[in-house]
């Protein structure tokens, strides 16, 4: 079976510089120009320069565990690093009431399999709009039925 790195090939942004603030989120963030769904094969180009302090984003989690490659779409209006740290805590604490915590607490999964990237910078500060964009990407990437975005 192919690895997630093969399935979700990305081009790394060469001019990206981590925030240099001893950020605990940056090691988990993949900085890319494109994201590819491991289920549908759809490729999305990233629409704006982004980093861990970017707000109003749709983001994409990939499980890098060989043979798994499941993905999750989420949104945040806060700084991206704040949301990343929450996901990391869910995983490290085995919080199975949260989708990412549940997935990464499965047998042979752990925090080293967690990768996250910004999928889209939403250009308007409208809660209803960002929620709709999140739903569109969940449908587009089939993350509800064949991904980590499952209802508990």
Locations of the language-model features?
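Charged structural interfaces that engage phosphate-rich ligands
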Residues: 1-152
């Amino acid at each position: 079976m192919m690895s997630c790195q093969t399935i979700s090939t990305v081009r790394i942004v060469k001019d990206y510089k981590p925030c240099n603030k001893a950020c605990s989120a940056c090691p988990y963030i993949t900085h890319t120009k494109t994201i590819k769904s491991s289920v549908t094969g759809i490729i999305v180009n990233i629409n704006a320069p982004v980093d861990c302090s970017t707000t109003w984003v749709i983001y994409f989690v990939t499980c890098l565990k060989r043979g798994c490659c499941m993905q999750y779409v989420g949104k945040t209006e806060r700084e991206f690093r704040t949301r990343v740290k929450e996901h990391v805590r869910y995983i490290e604490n085995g919080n199975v009431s949260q989708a990412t915590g549940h997935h990464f607490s499965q047998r042979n999964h752990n925090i080293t399999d967690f990768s996250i990237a910004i999928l889209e910078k939403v250009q308007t500060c409208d809660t209803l709009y960002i929620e709709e964009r999140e739903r569109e990407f969940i449908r587009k990437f089939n993350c509800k039925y064949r991904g980590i975005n499952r209802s508990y």
